[in-house]
């Protein structure tokens, strides 16, 4: 039964996901981590590309979320549709515009274009926070330093006197003061450095070490290192790089002379220099004497001194953090990290914590980062923070791979560093196939999102906006250690598809194993089908059945379709190959294993990756799309459906082009998307009843079968969600690397358009959440929802303690004062929802067919419902031992 919905009932909200933010100028400044510990060291404040999150170090939970989209000022700064988006470069504790500020709940945020915002990270976000703009000409803010009430800012700029092809940056150092009378920041020039290759700041923020190149000479090896004090003249020295290179090093390869990282201690006495060869040089700045630390096999990517200079942290491609005791030359290791270490810092006034940034370079389509906060005393993990980890079909924009001694798909060598950036930019603009789709599955039981991530799977809670688990599902080198140098060419097994049975009790994965390169068998791939299960009290999935080459040697699986509940209680699935073959797998309780039950041999004389499957709810019919043919099969006989006598039933359709996806709606209509059209076929009539032209958006853009990731169906109402991505052009009509997308909601036969929404980024996937909503993911790893109901806790910043201030008491009482406070809080919630409704209705009055519709963040529909104190009477039943989150959920159920 199809539910009749009006266009105003669907709303769009961007509510979850996001990437942890790094300093965009980190390739120059060397300090990538922007996250800060609070003054009491109980909270860890970390910026994302769409929000700022505050984590409790003790409970490991996110206790506050400041979403940019929920504040007009923040959304105006960070969510503009521009090629160079605003990004956070520094967070300082307190309000720096007020001297001697003692409020521990405030932070001052600096952006790369000079915006300064003062935010409250505890309690409710102020509607109009303080906002200032530092006047910068053609400069970008790179860092901000603070010492005893004095402030310095470091900016980067392109020196116009240098050649156009010169990619080096120049620095300016300014003194920063706030004029309270004029209510503005003023800057005073302090120093300037040109052609900076690399730099780093001491952990106390008082010393700057940088390496510059002399471009006036033809000698590309002529480089110098300088160490300067930012707030006084106590330290100011410079020396050529060659003076700290041994004669043996100078005669070896360029990797032994290429500096990949640096660190300066707080006293200005020691300088650590890491090379692409893996060697670390400790330089005594008093006499330029050096000693070598050798353990790393590939490039040293990060270095940091402890506060007293007695320890050195180092990290690289080995996925191991090394802690060097400099007096004794002894080492401690923290191995088996999830990624290579691209940044390490010492945090806290006493250096109680180490912060690490890991990059999972196995995914070369995206920059996947994970932030770790470690206890310095025992190296135990206190926090592990990351967003969704999608693997896109093609490499997206702004991807930066670390430097390695070798040039591979997952790394950049010294010679290819700048060339790879230009090549990738040209490819993004000129390539015809702009396929940035990804594969995501939703668990039918707990609604968690499953992201296949090369050899592993990430389990992400959409509603809590947190990673639940990260589990390796294949056997590969990368599972237990990092790869260095030539090992980077070894390809790990890749999980290409993942499905769940309808009851959510079984997970089905399909992976491909690759043999080593440069062998006669290099093209002989191994295809593996695995069936997994887990108990409710377990975290990891357990392998039950493994099938090697299920469709034959070197025959890939092109489609997996779980069975409906009517077939073996949903514990079954279909697999299809690229030659028209079908196999039915089912769990056999007698064998206590998954077994092959039925097989349909290939019945086509050619190969195609355009394969689609659909299954009727009663399990009797299978719809098999292969190339441009759509066949109806009888499940009992596993052969082409044959009609009864005296009846005429169409059992095969021929479409205009290759079929990309097939969706069966209410066992009546079949939605078929090809390269050129979107069709609705009425099975009772045996004819196409509605059709839309998709040729300008789909033809040649997506890989065969990937259009299925951009079309989904609400199995309860029959409504269809379709995503259309469009590449933007500049004023001259030249294509750019930016995109916008449109989500269109249709009814079950495509006759009525129920919703039309525009999003400012490329949408890579959309899926139905087994309830009333559609969830989507864009290439910035942000998650959104299009649905008839949107949870207020998702669209608003997390602030449970602030919303429930009127409810917190040692004992729950019914006094008049508590009732008044409770009613006031509920009134604020209701009034905020009504304001959102008014804004949403005005937005949706626009013409749904307008091609350049502006993006609106719509925070969901609230039902007009009478709320009084009697509405909450039942909520106080069994109130003992109820957590605040559960109590808040009860409030929201009453309101919605």
Swiss-Prot record:
One of its GO terms (molecular function) is U3 snoRNA binding. WD repeats lie at residues 295-334, 490-542, 552-595, 605-645. Keywords: Nucleus, Repeat, Ribonucleoprotein, Ribosome biogenesis, rRNA processing, Transcription, WD repeat. InterPro entries: WD40/YVTN_repeat-like_dom_sf, WD40_repeat_dom_sf, WD40_rpt, WDR75. The keyword Transcription applies. Involved in nucleolar processing of pre-18S ribosomal RNA. Required for optimal pre-ribosomal RNA transcription by RNA polymerase I together with a subset of U3 proteins required for transcription (t-UTPs). Present with 6560 molecules/cell in log phase SD medium. This is NET1-associated nuclear protein 1. The lineage of its organism: Eukaryota, Fungi, Dikarya, Ascomycota, Saccharomycotina.
């Amino acid at each position: 039964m199809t539910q009749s919905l009006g266009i105003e009932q669907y709303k769009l909200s961007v509510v979850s996901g996001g990437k942890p933010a790094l300093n965009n100028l980190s390739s120059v400044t060397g300090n990538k981590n922007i996250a800060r510990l609070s003054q009491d060291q109980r909270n860890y404040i970390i910026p994302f590309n769409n929000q700022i999150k505050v984590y409790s170090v003790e409970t490991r939970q996110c206790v506050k979320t400041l979403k940019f989209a929920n504040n007009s000022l923040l959304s105006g700064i960070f969510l503009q549709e521009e090629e160079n988006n605003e990004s956070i470069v520094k967070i300082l504790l307190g309000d720096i515009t007020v001297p001697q500020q003692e409020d521990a709940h405030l932070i001052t945020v600096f952006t790369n274009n000079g915006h300064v915002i003062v935010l409250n990270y505890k309690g409710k976000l102020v509607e109009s926070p303080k906002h200032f703009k530092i006047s910068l000409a053609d400069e970008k803010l790179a860092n901000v330093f603070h010492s005893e009430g004095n402030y310095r800012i470091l900016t980067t700029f392109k020196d116009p006197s240098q050649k156009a092809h010169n990619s080096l940056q120049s620095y300016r150092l300014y003194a920063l003061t706030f004029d309270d009378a004029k209510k503005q920041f003023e800057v005073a020039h302090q120093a300037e450095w040109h052609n900076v290759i690399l730099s780093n700041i001491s952990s106390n923020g008082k010393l700057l070490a940088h390496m510059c190149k002399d471009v006036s000479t033809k000698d590309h090896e002529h480089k110098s290192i300088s160490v300067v004090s930012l707030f006084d003249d106590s330290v100011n020295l410079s020396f050529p790089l060659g003076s700290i290179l041994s004669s043996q090093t100078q005669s070896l390869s360029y990797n032994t002379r290429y500096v990949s990282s640096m660190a300066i201690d707080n006293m200005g006495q020691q300088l650590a220099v890491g090379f692409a060869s893996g060697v670390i040089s400790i330089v005594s700045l008093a006499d330029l004497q050096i000693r070598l630390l050798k353990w790393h096999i590939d490039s040293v990517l990060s270095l940091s001194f402890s506060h007293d200079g007695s320890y050195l942290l180092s990290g690289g491609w080995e996925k191991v953090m090394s802690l060097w005791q400099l007096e004794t030359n002894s080492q401690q290791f923290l191995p088996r990290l999830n990624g290579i270490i691209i940044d390490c810092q010492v945090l806290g006034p006493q250096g109680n914590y180490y912060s690490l940034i890991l990059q999972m370079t196995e995914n070369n389509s995206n920059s996947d980062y994970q932030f770790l906060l470690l206890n310095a005393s025992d190296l135990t993990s206190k926090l592990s923070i990351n967003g969704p980890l999608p693997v896109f079909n093609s490499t997206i924009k702004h991807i930066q791979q670390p430097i390695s001694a070798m040039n591979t798909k997952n790394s950049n060598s010294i010679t290819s560093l700048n060339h790879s950036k230009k090549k990738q930019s040209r490819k993004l603009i000129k390539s015809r196939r702009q396929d940035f789709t990804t594969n995501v599955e939703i668990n039918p039981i707990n609604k968690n999102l499953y992201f296949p991530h090369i050899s592993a799977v990430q389990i992400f809670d959409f509603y809590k906006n947190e990673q639940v688990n990260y589990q390796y599902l294949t056997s590969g080198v990368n599972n237990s250690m990092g790869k260095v140098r030539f090992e980077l060419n070894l390809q790990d097994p890749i999980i290409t598809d993942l499905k769940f049975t309808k009851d959510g009790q079984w997970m089905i994965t399909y992976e491909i194993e690759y043999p080593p390169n440069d062998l006669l068998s290099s093209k002989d791939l191994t295809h593996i089908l695995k069936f997994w299960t887990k108990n409710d009290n377990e975290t990891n999935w357990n392998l039950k059945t493994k099938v090697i080459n299920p469709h034959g040697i070197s025959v890939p699986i092109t489609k997996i379709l779980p069975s409906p509940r009517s077939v073996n209680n949903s514990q079954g699935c279909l697999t299809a190959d690229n030659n028209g073959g079908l196999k039915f797998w089912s769990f056999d309780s007698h064998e206590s294993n998954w077994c092959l039950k039925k097989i349909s041999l290939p019945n086509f004389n050619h190969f195609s990756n355009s394969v689609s499957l659909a299954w009727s709810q009663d399990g009797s019919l299978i719809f098999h799309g292969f190339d441009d043919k759509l066949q109806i099969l009888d499940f009992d006989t596993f052969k082409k459906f044959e009609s009864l006598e005296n009846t005429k039933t169409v059992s095969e359709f021929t479409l205009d082009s290759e079929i990309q996806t097939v969706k069966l709606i209410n066992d009546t209509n079949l939605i078929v998307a090809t390269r050129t059209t979107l069709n609705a076929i009425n099975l009772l009539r045996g004819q196409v009843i509605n059709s839309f032209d998709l040729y300008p958006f789909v033809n040649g853009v997506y890989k065969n079968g990937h259009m299925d990731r951009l079309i989904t169906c609400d199995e309860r109402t029959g409504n269809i969600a379709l995503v259309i991505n469009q590449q933007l052009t500049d004023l001259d009509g030249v294509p750019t690397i930016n995109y916008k997308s449109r989500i269109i909601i249709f009814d079950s036969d495509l006759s009525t358009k129920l919703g039309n929404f525009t999003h400012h980024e490329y949408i890579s996937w959309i899926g139905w959440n087994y309830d009333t909503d559609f969830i989507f993911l864009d290439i910035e790893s942000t998650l959104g929802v299009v649905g008839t109901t949107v949870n207020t806790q998702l669209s608003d910043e997390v602030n449970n303690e602030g919303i429930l201030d009127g409810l917190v008491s040692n004992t729950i009482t019914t006094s008049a004062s508590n009732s008044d406070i409770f009613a006031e809080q509920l009134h604020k919630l209701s009034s905020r929802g009504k304001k959102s409704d008014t804004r949403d209705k005005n937005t949706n009055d626009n013409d749904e067919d307008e091609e350049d519709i502006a993006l609106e963040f719509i925070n969901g529909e609230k039902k007009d419902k009478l709320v009084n104190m009697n509405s909450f009477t039942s909520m106080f039943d069994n109130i003992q031992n109820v957590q605040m989150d559960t109590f808040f959920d009860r409030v929201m159920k009453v309101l919605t």
